[in-house]
Amino acid sequence: MDLAIVLPAVTSILALAFALALFDQWRERRGGFQLIWAIGMVFYGIGAGCEALAAAGGWTEGLYRTWYLTGAVWTAGWLGLGTAYLLGKTRFGYSFALSLFLAGLFTFLVRNRPEYAGAGAMPLLYFIAAGLLALAVAVETYFANDRWPILAASAVVGATILSLVLMATATLPAPGYAVDPATGAPVATLFPPQLRLLTPFLNITGAFALILGAVFSTYVFMPKRRVLAYSLDPNQPGDEFLFNLFIAPFAIAVNLVASLPGTARALVAGRLHSRVPATILIAVGAFVATLGDTLSRFGMTEWFQLGKFLGVLFLFAGFLVSIEVFRVIRVPFTSIRLGRVRQEPAGAERLAAAADVADAPDGTDRSGGPGVPTEHHAG
């Protein structure tokens, strides 16, 4: 059994099956986040499928181009965008704005690396675009407008369209593909730097959004012990708001750690909202997949396939655990149920209601948007 073929093939099958299930859930419930996640998982599956086909029959220029766009450029960005739509009615917009800004900043800072020689002014343009969009998302979030995911979508969709244009105009030297001679894993060395810079732009934005979104949701839905207080009430004086915005990540981290014992007790008692374990699994999946991709960029390509396989396993498990995403688990596009309709435990709903109380304008812990029940993040 050749793992170079089996591992990406199984990864592709799991990702595409996952995408099919998400499309089915979207067809019934019309959750925008389900549709966007489904698109992201289709890209994940196609990218892994290209690797399996190449391992079995050799690389071609068509496979190489398809692999790079779907697997290396698009997947993480679209999965992160799905998280933005899931949390579109909350203050998570600040986190997405930070993800966008860091992606643009990284793209600009690496412009002088040898592999990006010839990129010209594109790194600066990417940075400016990311900065402006990040500012716009933050402003929309500040005024509690749930339109900020549309701005997030403009970044991801815009980068996707640009990557298509750059790919269509790129001429690759023979043989039309490049692989690591030691492991046979594909590498992006043949693509123009303007296109290659879109990879960290979308990957950092998407991976950070997935991981931060998982931490955000875990914090909102876990029984909280508030050790450090903060407020993101937009009605407070500007200097106080900026101070609270600055300390919010530290306060959330401290409060999250302090809340872990109570969360463990709620889990044992069957009172924990499904969003908590689900989002932890999703965060682990995003981290593992991103880690494998990052290591491959530094020449350690032997972890590339394993990282993608483990990533899709954790992501799939996280989404299946989430009652919000899969209230009914069934064979896609049929009425054949694989179990009964699932409901959150009564204790979990009380914990979610407690999160609403903490979210009041005069509260000290604004995890969500004003007047928006946090258990209805999906819209």
Regions flagged by a language model, labelled:
Residues 1-28, 137, 204-223, 246-262:
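First transmembrane helix
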Residues 142-159, 215-284:
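Membrane-helix boundary/juxtamembrane motif in polytopic membrane proteins
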Residues 28-41, 91-100, 147-155, 272-282, ...:
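Membrane-interfacial loop-to-transmembrane alpha-helix junctions, especially the N-terminal start
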Residues 354-379:
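Long, low-complexity, intrinsically disordered segments
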Residues 1-15, 31-134, 306-313:
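Individual alpha-helical transmembrane segments in multi-pass integral membrane proteins
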Residues 212-221, 255-359:
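C-terminal transmembrane-bundle signature of multipass membrane proteins
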